[in-house]
């Protein structure tokens, strides 16, 4: 069950967003993007800090809300972010500039993730965040697990799909795919995974060392 509206508002209010993130959030809405909730952003920052992330990959740049939170948590990290929409990335680039993030710390790639991900170096990232087309989520997770280093995390935003994943009456392909993934992850020896109900849900998949 998703977090109640009262608790969700409380957690979002706790996650203090500065003017730069607020402006990026407003830009997201204007562009028709559904940004992560402030509480999810705070969780991303905490994970990035705990991981001491140096290299972060993001699938779905949006207007920069997620990227700002991740780089807040890992101020020494470099972010590589993929999106099909150049307009979105231009807004993100402007947001990063307003936050004082050097251009060298935010590499934006305009293109389809399914074309870009296979060309990236395996085991090179501390965090891979997926916040993109739900229909391609399984494909992106498969690539992400190869790209993240041992001990690193693959994060999937909007992992509860507006509560649909928990509703037995919902049987779309996207929902079925996510349910299947969650079930597979729960019994896997290669990863540890958990879903946080904060916001619209955040799935964290930690890559484990191969058994000796």
Placement of each model-derived feature along the sequence:
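A short alpha-helical cap/connector motif
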Residues: 1-127, 134-153, 159-212
